[in-house]
Structure formats: structure tokens, C-alpha cells
Amino acid sequence: LLMAVGALAGCGGEKKADDSKKMVTVGIAQLVEHGALDAANKGFVAGMASKGFKENENVKYDRQNAQADQSNLQNIAQRFVSNKVDLICAIATPTAQTMANATKDIPIVATAVTDYEVAKLAASNSEPKGNVTGTSDMNPIDQQLELLLKIAPQTKNIGTVYSSSEVNSQLQVDVLKKLAGDKGINVIEATVSTVNDIQQAAHSLVGKVDAVYVPTDNVMASSMPTLVAVTDEARLPVICGESDP
């Protein structure tokens, strides 16, 4: 897995807080507000602090949230480039992709990204090159499937709901289909574009599936209660990558 360095190592040599007294500026770009991404944001800042970078002492954060809007992400990227921030923390796959498209010079540390190679953020997950590095939030899908089958051992059809615009979600669904197929289980997909599509997508699976799997997906994580309201009524078990508490 790609490993992010907490200090301003970024994609180059390690640079500790004691090396310079100057104030550094870090742009933090978050795709949308939900529990998992909020925790990643706080964790990054805490990691920086553990390396000696204290907010308003030797590091200044420019925190931006795109509210799940691609045009907002592009504006945030241009803001960071124009302001010549020293480092960008990109939270979620679409965020990292937008930041990487905007600059090849500013180091980018990404988090809440499932697969850097699939997202075209790196040539290899094991050996990142260029200005992007980070951590992966890939689910143990094989273990999740085993758990689902323990809960609902008679499962023959699994429904999955995910965002059609997130390559990280498609990757996880492809893995699920392979693992489930090896067990003779069918996977039925229902994709969404926005949170407004979730209820209809969930209803489309009722009567067709025995259980539901939701990958790590930003659209889904921000509105899991909408899906669960449907699956609870239909008495369908749900296994998910993450959800906003």
C-alpha cells in the first residue's frame, strides 16, 4: 500500500518541523462532509501535529470542502495552485484526481482513496512516483462476503448500490462479483449519481436480492440512512464499507 508521511515528506525527502522556522501552508481539500472523511481530515492534522507541525505556530491550514460538487473541487484546486501552498491533503478519490490534474509540482498526500493505480494517481500502488502519495482505504471484501454469508447463509443474490462516478466503488464491486461468482452467487448492481437516487435504487433491488453490499463510496456513506430505511422494511441484511454515524 502507499504510505503517507505525516510531515512534509510528501513525495520527496523527509522535512521535519525543526528544519525551518517558516510558516508552511497546507491546503486540505475534502470531497463532502460525512463521518469517515471528517475523521480522515482530523487524523491528518493530528498526524502533522505529532511530527511537530502545530497549527498557527509553524503550519497554516486552508480547509476547503467541495460539498460533493466537481466544479467546487476544480475551484479549490486552482485556489491551492494560485496560492502556492506547500502541500495538499486530498481526501477521497475524486478529490485526489482533481488535485493531481491541477498540479504536478505541489506534493499531494491523499487519504480515503481505494486504489491509486486504478484511479490513475500512480503507476503502481507499491511504488508511487510523481507528486502523489497516500494511504488506501480498500475494504477486506473477502472477509465482508464471508460475514454476509454467516448472517444470511441462504444468499443466492446480492444487491449492491454505489455511485457510477467513483472508480473506487466500481473496483470494489468488480472484486465482489469475482468472489461471489466463485461461490455461485449472483451480484445485481444499482448505480446512483446523487443521494437523491438512493431510495429508488434501493427499491429496485427489493424482491430480487437476499442481501445488500455497499462499497466504500462517498455518495452512499453520506446518506446510508436512506438506503437502510428501505432494506430494513424489506428485512434485507446490509454489509457496508463505511457509513456516516
Located regions from the model:
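An alpha-beta-alpha
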Residues: 26, 44, 133-180
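Pocket-lining segment of extracytoplasmic ligand-binding domains
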Residues: 161, 167-242
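Short, low-complexity disordered leader/linker segments with a strong preference
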Residues: 1-25, 50, 54
